[in-house]
Amino acid sequence: MSRFWSPVVHTLTPYVPGEQPQLKRLLKLNTNESPYGPSPLVLAAIAEQNTADLRLYPDPSGFELKQTIAQQYGLAVDQIFLGNGSDEVLAHVFLGLLKHEQAVLFPDITYSFYPVYCKLFGIQAQTVPLGSNFEICLADYAKPNGGIIFPNPNAPTGRALASKAIAGLIQTNPNSVIVIDEAYVDYGTESCVPLLQGDSCPENVLVIQTLSKSRALAGLRVGFAMGHPRLIEALERVKNSFNSYPLGRLAQAGARAAIADQNYLEAISAKVIATRQVLITALDRLGFNTITSTANFVFTRHPQHTGVQLYQTLRARGIVVRHFNLPRIADYLRITIGTDEQNSELIQALQEII
């Protein structure tokens, strides 16, 4: 604490990211990174960049990357916004589109950066409780609001909504911005991007994705939003009032290659999905209660062991998972899906513990 802090700093409770262990021998299953490397085309695209050009600023608009994303998703270039990871995109969304007189709505158990942004930007927020099975109950969002945001699938639960249900939410909230955070969409969830295609694109819907998960580029920091050009214009205004150059040359080159290599995306996503099912089956046999997941993680608890006990015991064995010391979910662990070998090591440890 310092006397030089501004008043807002005293009120902040910052987001706490998952641990990044310094010990290399640890099995890291806590931050939902891909267990596989990025596409070889990504590495080649980065290597082909002229390092002499690193003295020059990158394209502030990221036009070529926007073109690649637009072509891949069937959208127009002016429907794409780029950011330094989806967290930066979300920050601009909260400031540019969700700060209104009425409160923004989001689930009570969800991505914990949402309330942090609300506090930082002075945005009113109202959490909406998940159902008894940790499902998002869209009927509970039928109330006056200054915007609605939720991940699909939700995090940390992994539960997803069908795009048809979300389309109904959009129709009943024509005067609010609806933000669908699709960080984990490629592991079995139906994307809402088709709702944005063509002349019928709703004026109030934004879909956010990232290259950090299924495209295995968490270290490159690239995220993007897709939506109506008027929403994108608002985000560009915020970005250019904050940082006109969010993506470096190497990031833009690597991201273009990652977006274009759909075959690699589908291949490694399929591997994660298969390994996820193996883990769920093993957890069931050990007596765990696991929430149905369409993400690259599972959310699970054991009726005879507390969450913190399991977390600490696994940590002592060199396996790091995520534990949230929060109401309703304190006994749950969020476990990232690793390789088949990592999965086997985790299952063996749990068998010995249980």
Predicted regions: what is each one?
Residues 1-56, 144:
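N-terminal "arm"/small-domain region of PLP-dependent enzymes with the aminotransferase-like
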Residues 96-151:
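PLP-dependent aminotransferase-like
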Residues 119, 135-144, 156-178, 182-217, ...:
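Active-site pre-lysine segment of PLP-dependent enzymes
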Residues 204-284, 288-291:
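PLP-dependent aminotransferase class I/II
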Residues 63-103:
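Phosphate-binding glycine-rich loop
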Residues 313-317, 322, 326-354:
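PLP-dependent enzyme catalytic core of the Aspartate aminotransferase-like
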Residues 272-273, 285-317, 333:
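Conserved PLP-binding catalytic core of the aspartate aminotransferase-like
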